[in-house]
Design a protein with these regions (language model features):
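Short solvent-exposed coil/turn linkers within tandem alpha-helical repeat scaffolds
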Residues: 69-79, 92, 106-114, 140-149, ...
Length: 198
């Protein structure tokens, strides 16, 4: 034991130093940077809520846009900023940039996560990559089990039809009818089913 005593003490001291280093990094570097990023985002988020996509993304000359905040603050930027930047790019028709931002969205909110995946699908539709779009819509529907899933299943069905996968599309439409009949999509789903059930 005496031979290993110094080794054990050294390992314990190193572990304490590493733990303190992580704590110090979080407390005195990361958290202040995250707060600053949040403050910088405020004007851009107001523009986002007003659907001023260009201003929200790139700023107005006086305030930073979401893209610049992400570039300046990196991982300290709130997760929602990646989602918002992706939506801005999607609305502006910049589909590849939208996909890049949306792939980097790491938020924990299931509804926003599903929506970000669905928006990636919309971007793939814009790029006419219907196979990837279909994968996104199906994945989005699998993230949540509520009426929002019906919208993603409808998109999956329409996209499957675009790919000539009518039986797969019918499966998505029937899922809406059976599991989400009270959703907006559920009210009109019979016309999609009857069109393919012939």
């Amino acid at each position: 034991f005496k031979e290993n005593k110094n080794l054990i003490i050294g390992v314990a001291v190193a572990a304490v130093l590493v733990a303190f280093g992580i704590f110090a990094f979080q407390k005195w570097y990361y958290q202040p940077k995250a707060r600053e990023a949040q403050q910088q985002l405020y004007p851009a988020e107001m523009a986002f809520k007003a659907e001023s996509w260009e201003t929200a993304l790139n700023g107005d000359g006086n305030n930073l846009g979401i893209a610049q905040v992400i570039e300046d603050y990196g991982k300290a930027t709130p997760a929602a900023a990646w989602f918002e930047a992706g939506i801005c790019e999607l609305q502006l028709g910049n589909y590849e940039s939208a996909i890049d931002y949306l792939k980097n969205y790491k938020g924990k909110d299931a509804i926003l996560k599903a929506r970000s995946i669905s928006c990636m699908g919309d971007a793939y539709v814009g790029l006419e990559d219907y196979a990837k779009a279909l994968d996104c819509f199906v994945k989005a529907a699998g993230v949540i089990d509520n009426i929002y899933a019906a919208a993603y299943l409808l998109k999956a069905g329409v996209t499957a039809e675009q790919l000539g996968k009518n039986e797969e599309a019918l499966k998505y439409y029937k899922t809406i009818k059976e599991q989400y009949p009270q959703s907006m999509e559920g009210y009109d789903i019979d016309k999609y089913i009857s069109r393919l059930a012939k």
